[in-house]
C-alpha cells in the first residue's frame, strides 16, 4: 500500500519515470537464477511476491515508466557476502571477484564478469516489461589505484595498453 501511495503522489506531480533498484550489492528484488533475494527484503528468502513485477505493474497503471536500476560491480562487505553464504557470487565465482578495503567487487577486467552482467540484464529484460535499464557503479572503486587486478591485467590486458587505458576499455566494453 505504501508503494502505491508513493506512486500516486509521483503521478499527481507529473513524474513520469521511476527507477526501481532491482539489484543491490550481489542481491536482487526479483526472482533470479543468478543471485539471491535481497536480505533487506526477506532475509534472503523468497518473499511470497515479486517486487519488481509489482512495481512495474503499478507504475504502468499510472502511465509511469519503470526502469530497473542495477548496481554492477560492488558485491558487498565481508559481512554481507558471508550472510549470503553459498548463494553469493563470491562463493560461486571467487575468481571473478576482488576484495578491496573490506568490500568485494566483480572484476571488470575478467571477461566472465561482462558475460555475467549481460546475463543479469538479459534476465530482467526477458522476464519483465521494464521501460529501461539503469546501470549504476559502472566504474572501478574510488581508490582504483589500489584495486587488486594486476593478475587480470597480466592475463587479459594488452602489452600495448597501460593499466589505466585497459581499465577504461573494460568499462566501455561492459556498457
Per-range role (PLM):
Residues 1, 54-57, 67-127:
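Active-site-adjacent "subsite" loops/lids of carbohydrate-active enzymes
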Residues 5, 13, 112, 116-119, ...:
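A non-catalytic, amphipathic alpha-helix used as a structural packing/dimerization or gating element
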Residues 30-43, 74-101, 138-165:
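Aromatic- and acidic-residue-enriched segments that line the glycan-binding/catalytic groove
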Residues 10, 18, 59, 66, ...:
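Conserved, mostly hydrophobic/aromatic
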Residues 21-23, 69-73, 109, 135-138:
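Active-site-proximal beta-strand/loop segments in catalytic clefts of secreted hydrolases
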Residues 116-133, 141, 159-160:
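Active-site and adjacent substrate-binding regions of carbohydrate-active enzymes
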Residues 2-28, 127-132:
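Catalytic domains of carbohydrate-active enzymes, especially glycoside hydrolases
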Residues 6-7, 24-71, 157, 162-175:
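Aromatic-lined substrate-binding rim segments of carbohydrate-active enzymes
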Amino acid at each position: 500500500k505504501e508503494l502505491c501511495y508513493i506512486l500516486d503522489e509521483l503521478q499527481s506531480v507529473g513524474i513520469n519515470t521511476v527507477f526501481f533498484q532491482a539489484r543491490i550489492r550481489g542481491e536482487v528484488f526479483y526472482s533470479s537464477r543468478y543471485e539471491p533475494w535481497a536480505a533487506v527484503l526477506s532475509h534472503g528468502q523468497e518473499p511470497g511476491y515479486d517486487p519488481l513485477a509489482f512495481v512495474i505493474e503499478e507504475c504502468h497503471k499510472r502511465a509511469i515508466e519503470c526502469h530497473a536500476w542495477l548496481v554492477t560491480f560492488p558485491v558487498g562487505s565481508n559481512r554481507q557476502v558471508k550472510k549470503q553464504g553459498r548463494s553469493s557470487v563470491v562463493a560461486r565465482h571467487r575468481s571473478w571477484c576482488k576484495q578491496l578495503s573490506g568490500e568485494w567487487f566483480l572484476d571488470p577486467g575478467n571477461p566472465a564478469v561482462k558475460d555475467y552482467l549481460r546475463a543479469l540484464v538479459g534476465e530482467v529484460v526477458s522476464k519483465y516489461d521494464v521501460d529501461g535499464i539503469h546501470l549504476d557503479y559502472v566504474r572501478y572503486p574510488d581508490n582504483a589505484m589500489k584495486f587488486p587486478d594486476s593478475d587480470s591485467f597480466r592475463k587479459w590486458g594488452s602489452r600495448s595498453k597501460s593499466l589505466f587505458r585497459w581499465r577504461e576499455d573494460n568499462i566501455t566494453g561492459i556498457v
